[in-house]
Every structure is written in C-alpha cells, then in structure tokens.
Amino acid sequence: MVTCSMRCTEEHLLGAPAAFSSGKRKRDSGYSPGDATPGDRGEGGPDWPSAGIKKRVKYSRHRKQRLELRSCDSGVADLYETPSPSPVAPTPTNEPYDSPCTSMPDRLGLQSFSDYGHDCYLFNKSLEDKFLTVNCLKNQPQIKAESRCKLISWLIPVHKHLKLGFESLCLTVNILDRFLACTPVASDCFQLVGVTSLLIACKQVESRPPRVKQLLALCCDAFSREQLCNLECIILLKLCFRIGAPTINFFLQHFSLLRVTSVESPDTELIEATKSMTVARGIAELSLADYAFNAYSPSLVAACCLELADRMLCLRNPIGVRVSGYHQSLIKECVGKIDLLVSLNQDSLHRLLPSQFSVKSIKADN
C-alpha cells in the first residue's frame, strides 16, 4: 500500500539525480565492470573526445492547444477549450422538444421492438413496485403537495429549455420522490434538490447532460457548486445508486408501438400512433406535477394517458387500456382523475403540446 510518506520519499529521491550515477545504477542491476563501455570508464575512443560523450540538447516542447484541467460535472470532461457560440440567434422552430416523429416511423426500430419489446416490457414491469413511492411527503414537515407541484411545474419548462427528453423529466420526478420518501428536506433547499435530481437523471439518460453552472444560473445563483455536488452524493447514497427506474415514457412508447401491427404497417398507423403519444406525453406531464397520481404505477398512468389522448383525437383505432393488464375498476378510477385534471388545465395542456396541435384539433371535453 502506497502511503503519503512513501510518496514523499520517492519524490525526494527523484528530485536528487546527482546522488545516482550511471555506473551505480548498472551495478545495482547486476552490471559487471567488464561490461562497461569506454564512455562509462572515461576512456576516449577514436571518435570520442576525452571529456566523454556530449549529452543531447533537450528543447522545450510546445503544445498546439492548451489543455485546461478542470473538474467534470457532466460525466465527460471537456479537456479542450470549446469554440465560442455563434452570435447569431437560432431561428425558433415549432417542432416539439422531444418529437416522437423521428422514432415511431423508423422501420428498424419497429423490427427491434418486435424482437425484444415484450421482454423489455416484462423486465420494466417487474421493477415498478421496487421504484414506486407512495405518500413520499408523509415524513416531510416543511414540504407539502403544493410545494412539490410548484417545483415540478418549474422543472417542466426548465427541461424543455435545456432541450432534454421526456425520459429525463420522468426519471427526475422519480428520483425526487424517492429521496423525499427517505430524507427530510428543508423548504429553503427544495429547489436545489430538484435541479440535483435533474442532473442525476440527465447523467443517466442524456448523451450531453447540462453543466452545473447552467443549472445554478437557472436558480439565480442561489446555491453554490459545492452545495449541488455534495447533495448529489447524498442523493446517490440514499438511493443506493439505484437510478434506472421504469418511467411513464417507456410505457408510453411501448403501448404506442403495440398499436403498429407490423413492420410493413401503413404510414397512417404510424402517424396516428405518433399523434396519440405526443398528446399523451403532454397529459403525463400534467400528472407528474399532481401529487394525487403519485400512488399509481407508471404503466397504469401511461395506459390511461393514451386512452384519454385517443378520445381527444377521435382516433379510429384506439389503443385501449386493456393492454395494461390492470383491473377495470382501477383503470376507471385513474382515467377519471386524469380526465378531471385535463379539464381543469386545458390552457396548460395546450402550452405543453407542439404548435401543430391546435385547440380545434383536440376535443378536450370528453
């Protein structure tokens, strides 16, 4: 075992090159005097000066690009200086932040789903109860359901501003609720718990997670970098590093792909599945902020959101909640709560949906 004292001794020895000669190093390694070269014995040869061999001159090395040593906060360290962004403002687009249009019509993805989709579904279905948090605010003296609703309602536009996927948002809420279920949190640092949960979820899901300074700037620099990093370690320890939880987003994708009959399905089926899943994601975002849906499993919420989305879009072939495998009474209860939630938050729902989903194209009154 290398200790600090041993390292100091090695540095001291390496810093004194005069104490070791080339001859001594050779003798220590089994070198015999008969194997010495004329240069080692100080004897001049026909081509060697009597003073010995001249040492080769060493020139200082210059790097083409300066390396910057800094701590990594997003999983991958940025060793080089990144180029400055273009001063031209990006052109705003009306595309959804996490559009399923790029994944649903993918024929290769449909083939992979037909091969492994059922096994993945069974695996995530078996993990639901282990990651489900019921009454996570039971032991929170300072955090109420209203505070949780405000925080998640703030995290929804934050994750859209950072162009993160819906999977990151679902995983963030799961990490947040599981941490609240086991650790009391003060109200003045509740926002820090939210952005730290978002950072952990992004490191698990996203290929380019946001940087710590970005998240701190969104909090108006109310917290320090050390506070966020320390809280990140605390959350990971409290959750025993069990981060990969089944989310609503996974079951939304699974049930939507079940709507597609085969790889050779017509484009109309793919378009309907895409529209339904997009509207269901907006409904699911509303349910994430509502504490009443904390007791329902992600697969049940996903199936009920798709059921309501099919009604709102008046699709010819609704997916139905029968694919979820739950009892009819439980499905009816969950669908009724989601229907009431949508009717009370119609304006918020239309703001969450892409611009192509106009108010007239969606029948919100069911």
UniProtKB/Swiss-Prot annotation:
It is found in: Cytoplasm. Pfam families: Cyclin_C, Cyclin_N. Residues 18-55, 80-99 are annotated as: Disordered. CDD domains: CYCLIN_CCNO_rpt1, CYCLIN_CCNO_rpt2. Changing residue 228 to P: Decreased formation of basal bodies in multiciliated cells. GO terms for biological process: cell division; cilium assembly; G1/S transition of mitotic cell cycle; multi-ciliated epithelial cell differentiation. This is Cyclin-O protein A. Belongs to the cyclin family. InterPro entries: Cyclin, Cyclin-like_dom, Cyclin-like_sf, Cyclin_C-dom, Cyclin_N, Cyclins_cyclin-box. It comes from the Eukaryota. One of its GO terms (molecular function) is cyclin-dependent protein serine/threonine kinase regulator activity. It comes from Xenopus laevis. Keywords: Cell cycle, Cell division, Cilium biogenesis/degradation, Cyclin, Cytoplasm.
